[in-house]
Amino acid sequence: MFVLVFIVFASGLTFGAEKDMVQFQGVLMTVDVKNRSMVVNEKLCVWNHQTLINDATGSPTTFDRLQTKNWVYIEGVYEKPHHRIVAKTIYLLPNRIDEKEKGLYPFIK
């Protein structure tokens, strides 16, 4: 019984180690709405049906507003095996948000 519990627990640790929460802002370099993917700061980001997209005020908006050279803030999970970030929430930003301005955007951590 102990061995079975240990194996299940150990495998849970392994899966958890392959995914990390990430939060960052950056410039959209490419966007492929058909394949639900984009490159932000040279990082591959994908989204799915659960991903939320909001404007800078936190109000919901649509994925067709994603355009190259625009700034975004991404909250997601880095999947090490696939070398990509699965976005949980995407925020459209007016520009790069520096330390002094972060208080204006409560979602930026």
PLM features: residue spans?
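Short, structured beta-strand/loop micro-motifs enriched in basic residues and often containing a Trp
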Residues: 49-57
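Short, flexible, surface-exposed loop segments at domain boundaries
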Residues: 1-44, 56-109
